[in-house]
A protein has these predicted regions:
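FAD-site-proximal beta/loop scaffold in flavoenzymes
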Residues: 1-20, 112-113, 120-191, 198
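Glycine-rich dinucleotide-binding loop and its adjacent helix/turn
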Residues: 1-38, 47-52
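Residues at the starts of beta-strands that form the adenosine-phosphate
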Residues: 29, 67, 164
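Glycine-rich loop/hinge motif
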Residues: 43
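A Rossmann-like FAD-binding core segment of flavoenzymes
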Residues: 47-155, 161
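Internal hydrophobic alpha-helix adjacent to the cofactor/substrate pocket in enzyme cavities
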Residues: 188-214
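Conserved small/polar residues in nucleotide/adenosyl-binding loops
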Residues: 237-243
């Protein structure tokens, strides 16, 4: 996070010293790819820096010259949240000055150019927040994987081909009761780790292992320094609060 902030500030410094208007705009364009919690948080934070914090710091450009884009291939940002909260998050971002682009797929990233199915954006500041590929170790297991390279696992977190090999966290595709894979977030990995560790220590055979059950305590996405949306258990809420983001 600190490296990203440093690179953002360096981009403004480059823009200040650049005489060519087109090149300067390249430094002032910021593109975040991926409308999940990480992408939303980054876009909001960048917008606050670009449109509020540096307004009086430079002479050769002003805050109106900066452009912050958030690109999401799906129909809405934050798809893990309800449509209502997703819409609120979009409104919050747009009020901060972020240009939110949904239903727009990134087809290629060239040097300083983001190519989508709807056009191009020239930028020296391109941040990928659209997810990660699973660990290359999964390929060596020679087991069933999904489209993202994650191991498709049983209800006891073991792989399909060997009940003594376990895969957890964002390297695994564990389907919940609705048939949807659990998100690749820390709480899932922590709970799976405790579950698997307990079975290993107790040397529980597969036919006696209780299925893993994830206890969802809620998720939250921050939007800039003073806005957030969250889901706590089955209750939905939107918050206005101070944060350290």
């Amino acid at each position: 996070a600190l490296d990203i902030r440093d690179n953002i500030l360096k981009a403004f410094e480059k823009a200040e010293n650049e005489l060519d208007k087109d090149v300067r705009q390249r430094y002032l364009n910021f593109v975040v790819i991926g409308g999940g919690p990480t992408g939303v948080e980054l876009a909001g934070s960048i917008a606050e820096i670009a449109f509020k914090n540096i307004n009086k710091e430079f002479r050769n450009f002003n805050s109106n010259d900066s452009k912050v884009y958030l690109i999401e291939a799906g129909s809405r940002i934050l798809p893990a949240f309800s449509p209502k909260l997703s819409f609120k998050a979009r409104i919050y971002l747009e009020k901060l000055g972020v240009t939110v682009k949904t239903d727009e797929k990134v087809e290629n990233i060239e040097e300083m150019i983001v190519v989508t199915d709807k056009g191009e954006i020239i930028s020296d500041n391109i941040i990928w927040a659209a997810g990660n590929k699973a660990s290359s170790l999964i390929e060596k297991l020679d087991t069933e994987t999904d489209s993202e390279g994650r191991a498709v696992i049983n209800q006891d977190c073991s792989i399909k081909d060997d009940d003594n090999i376990f895969v957890i966290g964002d390297a695994a595709n564990f389907k919940n009761s609705k048939g949807d894979p659990l998100p690749g977030i820390a709480p899932v990995a922590i709970q799976q780790g405790r579950y698997v560790g307990s079975n290993i220590i107790k040397d529980v055979p597969q036919n006696k292992r209780k299925p893993f059950k994830y206890m969802d305590k809620g998720i939250m996405a921050t939007i800039g320094g003073f806005k957030a949306i969250g889901v706590v258990a089955v209750s939905y809420t939107h918050l206005t609060l101070p944060t350290n983001v």
